[in-house]
Structures are given as structure tokens and as C-alpha cells.
Amino acid sequence: MATLYDNEAKIKQAIVLLQKVVNDTSVPRNIRRAASDAIRNLQDPSLSPAVRAANATAILDEISQDPNMPSQTRISIWNVVSILETIRD
């Protein structure tokens, strides 16, 4: 049961970091939209934490290849992905 709380804490931490990306107007709109989609996936209560993390990681991994992404945003995305990759059921 402790891992469930750990997973939820990691998801909340990832959401906070992604919210910063969404609220940063210097980030291109398509990247902010992908971050919003990832947040929506992370907040979906019908899926297990690992599935939510995997879905969000797929979105973020795809968008992290965008050449228009500012470097500080890319680092934030990578940090979120590394947090989400530690989530297991």
C-alpha cells in the first residue's frame, strides 16, 4: 500500500512540474498542449498509476524531440519523464 502513496506523490510532483511548462508563455503552443495532455492522462482515475505514467511518458517523449523547444523546458520534460519512469504497479 505504501507504493500506491509513493506513486501518487510522484504523479503529483510530475503534474506540478508540467504545470510550470503549461503556464510558461515562452514555450511554443504545441509543447504546452502536449504537457496539458500529459497532465490530463496523469489525472485519469480510471487507470492504474503505472498506466497513467506510461501514457504521459509516451506523450512527453514524443514532444521532447521538438527542435523548437527551449532548453530549460526540455530539461523540465526530461525530469518529469525520469520521475514517471520510476512508477510501477
From Swiss-Prot:
Protein name, UniProt field: UPF0147 protein Msed_2034
Protein family (similarity comment): Belongs to the UPF0147 family.
InterPro entries: Ta0600-like_sf, UPF0147
Disulphide bonds in the chain: none
Protein species of origin: Metallosphaera sedula (strain ATCC 51363 / DSM 5348 / JCM 9185 / NBRC 15509 / TH2)
